[in-house]
Amino acid sequence: MEEGVVGGGGAAVLVALLVTVVLAVMRSAGSRSSKRGRLPPSPMALPIIGHLHLIRPPPHRAFDRILARHGPLVYLRLGPSTHCVVIGSADVARDFLKFEASIPERPPTAVTRQLAYGKAGFAFAPYGAYWRFVKRLCMSELLGPRTVELLRPVRAAELADVLRAAQSAAERGEGVDMSHELVRMANNSIMRMVASALPGEMAEAARDCAKQVAELVGAFNAEDFVAVCRGWDLQGIGRRTNEVHARFDALLETIIEAKEEARRRSLRLGRRESSSKDLLDMLMDAAEDDTAEVKLTRDNIKAFVLDIFTAGSDTTATTVEWMLAELVNHPECMAKLRGELDAVVGRSRLVGEQDVARLPYLQAVLKETLRLRPPAVFAQRVTVEPVQVRGYTIPTDTQVFFNIFSIGRDATYWDQPLHFRPDRFLPDGAGATVDPKGQHPQLMPFGSGRRACPGMGLAMQAVPAFLAALVQCFDWAPPPSQPLPLDMEEAAGLVSARKHPLLLLPTPRIQPLPSFYS
């Protein structure tokens, strides 16, 4: 009897203590909430993991589902302490971009810290003197109009290899893996623009490294969201990152040493001319400039080359592949583009980058593909101070995801947003004045503002020309075993590529191919 009384008293004390703790936690949470202000709508979170269980790959699709249910601005907690907001409409994106000074940087991850030599590169460099210097270097020299034009023959030569591969496949009556051919073309083009005298075996090694870099950067890594996982490498991502970084670093060191020797030899012979410079030459010139406001280090050069190679090659190949796949699925659009090419360019010569400005339907196909199938499906920033937007307070150190995939399908701006309709971008279409270079939030495949992709000028010139040549020279159809429409499922990763290889049968339209490419 006495034991029952004592036990009952102990239970009462325990309950009282638990109630006190719960009330204290609630008061503390309320106090923190009042300090940080009102947050955007949010799905129900789980203890510890927050909303991680909702982010199934590919993440842009998961974000899109959440946005469809909770509105165009959503708060998520990924893990115990990683706070995020996701933007899914052009209007909300426009409101956020008014506070660009408050979201100037990209949040680094465990993988990018290692691969990008800390923050030595351009993509993840903090906003400041170094970032501004490299941005100017990019826009005026490395990826400026003069350099893009100067390196046009490099891109033309790589396109020639793709056309020859398609011609050979057609002669054998076989299909061609366009996914493989386009990745090879884009990677080789970028690497030869970076270092013109690159041996074939180095290009192959660089291509393999770039593929693994894209996989690692795009992979979910628990260490980025759950602090107790840091240092344990439970997924093996850290080990793989170290291995890829070591391989890429050794490759870059070999390329740089070869370039240094070539520059010394040219200088001795008096052959050093600006017209023959590639991007690596330009970076080395900047590093050797004693009057420059920022001194580039060897790690800066390596990180920058890595940025250009990984960002430029996969996105180029992916965009051309999506364009070609959409045209195969929409024969009426393919016929319209082919008619434009025949009328403007003809069949006596190959269409080139210089023709793009005179081909409005080609430009419309590119814009519609970038709207519906953006290769970079979200842009990521982090707040450096609280941001007041739409009645909500976004706290400092909150990751901001512009879900470009959802924004491009915003029904407020686009009629039938899930349909492939290039005509919307023709002069009499609703999107005639919409430009994809970041001025119109409803179409921002290259991001917007100071962190927009510096290579957009190159992309807008080279990508449509690649596609135009393929359409001008060949008819394309899937193998008999693969009926239309083509499967358009996306793969998870840093770049939103097609999940399955694009296998097509080419039939020559121009025989022989134009002499410049024969």
Curated annotation (Swiss-Prot):
Top-level taxon of origin: Eukaryota
Top EC class for this record: oxidoreductase
Keywords (A to Z) from UniProt: Flavonoid biosynthesis, Heme, Iron, Membrane, Metal-binding, Monooxygenase, Oxidoreductase, Transmembrane, Transmembrane helix
Protein name, per record: Cytochrome P450 93G2
Catalyzed chemical reaction(s): a flavanone + reduced [NADPH--hemoprotein reductase] + O2 = a 2-hydroxyflavanone + oxidized [NADPH--hemoprotein reductase] + H2O + H(+); (2S)-naringenin + reduced [NADPH--hemoprotein reductase] + O2 = (2S)-2-hydroxynaringenin + oxidized [NADPH--hemoprotein reductase] + H2O + H(+); (S)-eriodictyol + reduced [NADPH--hemoprotein reductase] + O2 = (2S)-2-hydroxyeriodictyol + oxidized [NADPH--hemoprotein reductase] + H2O + H(+)
Cofactor or coenzyme needed: heme
EC assignment: 1.14.14.162
Recorded topology in the membrane: Single-pass membrane protein
Disulfide bond entries: none
PANTHER family attached to this UniProt entry: 3,9-DIHYDROXYPTEROCARPAN 6A-MONOOXYGENASE, CYTOCHROME P450 98A9
Presence of keyword Magnesium: no
SUPFAM superfamilies assigned to the protein according to its UniProt record, in alphabetical order: Cytochrome P450
